[in-house]
Amino acid sequence: MSESAPTPRRERVIVGMSGGVDSSVSALLLLQQGYQVEGLFMKNWDEDDGTEYCTAREDLADAQAVCDRIGIKLHTANFAAEYWDNVFEHFLAEYKAGRTPNPDILCNREIKFKAFLDYALMLGADLIATGHYVRRRDRDGRTELLKGLDPNKDQSYFLHAVGGEQIARSLFPVGELEKPEVRAIAEKHGLATAKKKDSTGICFIGERRFTDFLKQYLPAQPGDIETIEGKVIGRHSGLMYHTIGQRQGLGIGGLKEAGDDPWYVLGKDLQRNVLLVGQGNDHPLLFSRALLASRIYWVNPVELERPRRLRAKVRYRQSDQDCVLEKTAEGYRAVFDEPQRAVTPGQSVVFYDGDVCLGGGVIETAEAWDFGGRP
């Protein structure tokens, strides 16, 4: 598909083909670079209700069309059992415990860079490749994970739990490009996915309402909505349907004495099954000075004998925040220079040294910011 014949390489690469434009262009670029390229389409969720919420059939058809266009073989593999055991059951357990998990992070660690990698190696591959917007760099005998070149698409946050050994066996061809360039390449070469919309949301939920999906697996436990002063002002249908900083969907209204400021979720009292709320986008209890994280995964070993100044994200697409990270008896504690809004237990905090993604962990608790004095 390239204008000039590439120099052949011995390495055999199997590309995880999702049916999207990023993996499509990744396969094309690797062909142009002379690799021996094949594709593999993963099915990670079994639709047992007769509907195609994940559009798996359409995605497979698109992946096949791209592979036919560029002249490579497409394998298929079903990792639904591994996904259920290693990702989905954890997802449910976290929601049951009142936290807000991010299944994409565990999916990358357990499925795309473990089950898929192992399967590809079994097929005789030397390397795998994906359409993630990240980069890798070999330095000082180890492989580092770097942010993608396009700051609007960088996905290092979601890959922070993948180890350096797995990164070393992986290629990320679009990590050096910006999204418009990727679409332009796909269009130039007539790929069926050139104008396909990016997938959003969690695969196994698809177009369904999140609350409707969760009700299939976890029984709802309605309870009171209280102000931080202890006044009951409404009812919630289940703590698992709400997250810190949430404004929409609280169903609070008609409180004349409360004024017009919108209500936000400030916290959850799990023992009493109470949702705690307050008014105002800048409510002090929405901000944290520090957090405690556990279940830490480092891409490569990190030296933390003493507190270390780093940068961090507490959510995807957040700008990097200055902090000091230290290891304590309770876990890893990050103290931020500036107040952090809506730090959410169950979500991930990811640490950076410049463009290098060092790793991260799961937020357990957050410490409120004291606006009355020194933080």
From Swiss-Prot:
InterPro entries (UniProt xref): MnmA-like, MnmA-like_C, MnmA-like_central, MnmA-like_central_sf, Rossmann-like_a/b/a_fold
Pfam families, alphabetized: tRNA_Me_trans, tRNA_Me_trans_C, tRNA_Me_trans_M
GO biological process: tRNA wobble position uridine thiolation
The reaction(s) this protein catalyses: S-sulfanyl-L-cysteinyl-[protein] + uridine(34) in tRNA + AH2 + ATP = 2-thiouridine(34) in tRNA + L-cysteinyl-[protein] + A + AMP + diphosphate + H(+)
Gene Ontology terms: cellular component: cytoplasm
EC class (word): transferase
Function: Catalyzes the 2-thiolation of uridine at the wobble position (U34) of tRNA, leading to the formation of s(2)U34.
Residues at the active site: 107 (nucleophile), 203 (cysteine persulfide intermediate)
EC number: 2.8.1.13
Positions of disulphide bridges: 107-203
Location in or out of the cell: Cytoplasm
Record-given protein name: tRNA-specific 2-thiouridylase MnmA
Primary site of residence: cytoplasm
Molecular-function GO terms, alphabetical: ATP binding; tRNA binding; tRNA-uridine 2-sulfurtransferase activity
Region (Interaction with tRNA): 153-155, 315-316
Site-annotated residues for Interaction with tRNA: 132, 347
Keywords assigned by UniProt, alphabetized: ATP-binding, Cytoplasm, Disulfide bond, Nucleotide-binding, RNA-binding, Transferase, tRNA processing, tRNA-binding
Residue span of region Interaction with target base in tRNA: 102-104
Binding site for ATP: 16-23, 42, 131
Family: Belongs to the MnmA/TRMU family.
